[in-house]
């Protein structure tokens, strides 16, 4: 006769919803960051030509910016969750709309203004890269602060980087095979911006008890979601207009 074994897992060792939200955020941050990087490189190649040069400079600029963001993260000392939410919303808005902004700028600028377009391109890549670079160190610090009893430092780093690299792997495969063929570059960027914003909304609910000005944070999250959903529906018209001007 079989017996049912009692649950001997200590309550403090069970995975909390906040922990799941943060690890999911790492996966999404990595996936979205790579999408924005690939979309910028692909658009630059399409609009400016010389794909090797465009991808090399975009990827190099993005990684450099992530390094700056990681270094700057040490300056954030208080309200880590609130700061993470703000950064996540900025990444969602700027990164998600970056392909659309680049298409719009290229269609609006004179053909001779490639210099201005490059300034916008690398400026946006720098901003998104810095913001993404800020996120991962913040997530690690939040995990350590809230769930430090579950993790030694080596386990924390291992967990976070595992989800980071898994997110990058999924996007590296899906971007050329599924996302761009079915959604196009503009919708792909906006879709992943929505994912960033949804992670912010989830974290907003999970960490509600420790957030100041929760209603303001919720309103900002809702506004970003509304903008991105509207952009998703308008992406086809923008693509058609920009391609007619190309």
PLM region spans:
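Alpha-helical transmembrane segments of multi-pass membrane proteins
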Residues: 2-246
């Amino acid at each position: 006769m079989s017996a049912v074994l009692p649950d001997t897992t200590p309550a403090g060792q069970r995975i909390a919803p906040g922990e799941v939200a943060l690890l999911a955020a790492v996966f999404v941050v990595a996936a979205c960051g790579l999408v924005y990087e690939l979309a910028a490189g692909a658009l630059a190649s399409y609009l400016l030509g010389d794909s090797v040069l465009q991808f090399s400079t975009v990827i190099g600029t993005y990684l450099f910016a992530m390094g700056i963001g990681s270094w700057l993260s040490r300056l954030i000392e208080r309200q880590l969750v609130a700061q993470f939410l703000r950064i996540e919303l900025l990444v969602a808005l700027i990164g998600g709309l970056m392909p659309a902004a680049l298409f719009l700028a290229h269609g609006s600028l004179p053909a001779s203004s490639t210099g201005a377009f490059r300034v916008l391109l690398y400026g946006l890549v720098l901003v998104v890269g810095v913001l993404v670079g800020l996120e991962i160190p913040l997530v690690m610090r939040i995990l350590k602060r809230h769930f430090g009893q579950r993790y030694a430092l080596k386990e924390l780093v291992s967990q976070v980087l595992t989800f980071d690299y898994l997110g990058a792997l999924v996007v590296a495969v899906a971007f050329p095979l599924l996302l761009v063929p079915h959604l196009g570059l503009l919708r792909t960027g906006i879709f992943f911006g929505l994912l960033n914003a949804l992670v912010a909304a989830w974290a907003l609910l999970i960490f509600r008890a420790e957030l100041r000005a929760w209603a303001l944070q919720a309103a900002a999250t809702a506004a970003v979601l509304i903008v991105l959903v509207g952009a998703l529906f308008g992406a086809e018209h923008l693509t058609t207009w920009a391609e007619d001007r190309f």
